[in-house]
């Protein structure tokens, strides 16, 4: 909540947000430390929380001013207390706030932080929203999905997830209506990048993947270099919400890889060696673009979330997986989409090699194939995603 005079225009939007919560059956909770007052139409100041109780009867307020058993905001105990009282798990909740204290509270509670900048903008943590309507759209179109992954492969330490199938074929209209947008977003920064990264982030959050990782990395593009400029910002923001480092330079493309389209046009045969022989790891990567590690962080006992946009046969992701696993660390692999009717093909034994050096492999065998149809576990996910993309593009306050 803000201090001082309330902006009537903004408060009207907040009222719409509260009405939206009620309409969707969502329970709002306010966690507060400080005493605050409100002055209406020249009347004497009155307790803000009493006013909010009257104005928003569906709102539950937790504050030490009313109950000394409630722990101080910012402490881990504060969110634990609220979650326990409400009967919620942390990844069933989002935290809307704007202050540094809000950020710390969300971080200590392992809760996804939505940064409301319409009152103030005092931290660079969290996903930024400039007005209540943006928050409502995010919740309505991304958080309230019921089908978070269309593809799931879990085989021992091997884990892979995808939001939905990928196809731009006119014969697959259910897939095509979102696949064109996704490809434009992933390859050219067009389409609706915010929707796709929002879908990825919420799927990972609400299925608890963030609880099982230590670091996040994006698989680099085909050109020499590191990182993925379409995803880096949101992946780092997601990681910072839970104190998971984003390692933009963990995987380096030391030599340009041939694109599949270029290979097809020029009739150049390529396989998984096109990826294995063009990447290497950085032993001392950079955390959140600021801090260079002095000791190798990716090692036994750690797990890296490795993210790519569109997966065809899995050669790129699996090359990254094999290099990371050579350090002793584990991986969880996630992509926006999975190409239809194409199996995920894992890479076989690579012998002894240095993952931090450029390598030239030959004759590396393929390992298991994970059938497309067998691991397409939720056919409704694609329909829901397409419908929610359309809703996202045209969203307005419910009538």
Where are these regions (language model features)?
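Conserved Lys-Pro-Asp/Glu-containing loop-to-beta segment of HAD-superfamily phosphomonoesterases
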Residues: 78-101, 302-308
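Substrate-recognition element of Asp-dependent hydrolases with the DxDx(T/V) motif
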Residues: 17-70
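A short, structured active-site edge motif that brings together acidic residues
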Residues: 57-74, 218-219, 244-258
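Active-site-facing substrate-recognition patch
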Residues: 140-215, 224-225, 229, 258-300, ...
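Active-site neighborhood of HAD-like aspartate-dependent phosphohydrolases
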Residues: 1-27
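PRPP-dependent phosphoribosyltransferase catalytic core
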Residues: 132-173, 318-399
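Acidic, Mg2+-coordinating phosphoryl-transfer loop and its flanking beta/alpha structural elements
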Residues: 95-130
């Amino acid at each position: 909540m803000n201090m001082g005079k309330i902006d009537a225009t903004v408060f009207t939007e907040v009222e719409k947000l509260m009405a939206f919560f009620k309409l969707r059956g969502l329970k709002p909770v306010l966690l507060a430390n400080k005493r605050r007052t409100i002055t209406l139409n020249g009347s004497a100041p009155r307790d803000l929380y009493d006013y909010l109780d009257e104005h928003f009867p569906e709102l539950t307020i937790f504050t030490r001013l009313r109950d000394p058993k409630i722990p101080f905001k910012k402490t881990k105990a504060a969110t634990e207390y609220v979650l326990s009282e409400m009967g919620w798990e942390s990844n069933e909740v989002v935290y809307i706030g704007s202050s540094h204290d809000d950020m710390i509270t969300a971080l200590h509670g392992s809760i996804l932080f939505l940064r409301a900048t319409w009152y103030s903008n005092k931290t660079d943590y969290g996903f930024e929203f400039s007005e209540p309507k943006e928050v409502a759209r995010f919740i309505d179109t991304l958080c309230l999905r019921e089908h978070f992954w269309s593809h799931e492969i879990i085989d021992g330490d091997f884990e892979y997830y995808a939001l939905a199938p990928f196809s731009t074929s006119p014969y697959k209209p259910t897939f095509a209506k979102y696949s064109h947008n996704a490809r434009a977003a992933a390859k050219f920064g067009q389409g609706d990048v915010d929707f796709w990264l929002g879908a990825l982030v919420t799927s990972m959050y609400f299925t608890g993947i963030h609880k099982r990782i230590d670091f996040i990395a994006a698989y680099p593009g085909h050109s020499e270099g590191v990182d993925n400029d379409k995803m880096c910002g949101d992946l780092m923001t997601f990681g910072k919400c839970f104190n998971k480092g984003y390692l933009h330079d963990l995987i380096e493309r030391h030599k340009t890889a041939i694109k599949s389209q270029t290979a097809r046009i020029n009739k150049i045969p390529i396989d998984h060696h096109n990826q294995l022989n063009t990447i290497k790891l950085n032993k001392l990567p950079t955390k959140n673009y600021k801090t260079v590690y002095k000791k190798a962080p990716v090692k036994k006992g750690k797990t890296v979330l490795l993210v790519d946009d569109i997966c065809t046969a899995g050669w790129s992701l699996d090359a990254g997986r094999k290099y990371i696993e050579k350090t002793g660390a584990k991986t969880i692999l996630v992509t926006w989409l999975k190409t239809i009717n194409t199996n995920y093909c894992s890479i076989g034994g690579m012998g002894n090699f240095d993952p931090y050096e450029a390598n030239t492999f030959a004759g590396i065998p393929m390992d298991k194939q994970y059938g497309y149809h067998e691991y397409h576990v939720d056919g409704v996910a694609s329909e829901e995603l397409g419908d929610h993309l359309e809703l996202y593009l045209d969203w307005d306050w419910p009538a």
